[in-house]
Amino acid sequence: MPYYPASFLSGHFKIRNVLVHVRCDVRDGADGERVLLLHEVQSDWAQSARRAIACGEMDPGDDGCPPFLKEWPALAMKLVLLHAAHQGLDAVAWSRGAHQVFRYEGLGAMGLNELYDRTLPREDNRMLRPLGGICETLGVFVPTNFGIFQTERGYEVYSLEDELLGAALTLEDARQFVPDQGHELLYEVHGVRLPESMREAILGSGF
């Protein structure tokens, strides 16, 4: 939000007023579906403001407070669902709170569990239930000794040593570059399925 009156710079970006950021990639699901897996959904701006409000250094109506202070998770999921529908993906999923707590070695466990296990499922159910969708447990395969990353030109496969093994236009074609000893684990995550009828409804009329 470069033209918002307030000015906030986070440690992640060199541009100001980034309201929310998402780190994600496309993974294979347990049933062969293409799943947009969210590894991180975060608002540095909102997090900083909430800390300042809790310490009495800021009021919710102050100029430095970001817009959508409480609504940013819902806004993030709307954008993610629109992107997934536009790309023709079969589902959107996100890691559990326990995965996030493990990643950050227990730091902010209460907030991570609240966001990933309660807030995101609640917002997805609110938006998708009228379209026949519901948050459920999905299985996704996560590589342990290689990586497949989406780029502007398709997909690239890397080894654990960060060596580029190959590139392709589609995820299916990129899999030919996975090493013979490549290994994946099946993780249970939160998610919502997006059948074709729901994708069309999202793109046609929104939420």
Question: Whereabouts are the PLM-identified features?
Answer:
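Charge-dense, intrinsically disordered terminal/linker segments
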Residues: M1-F207
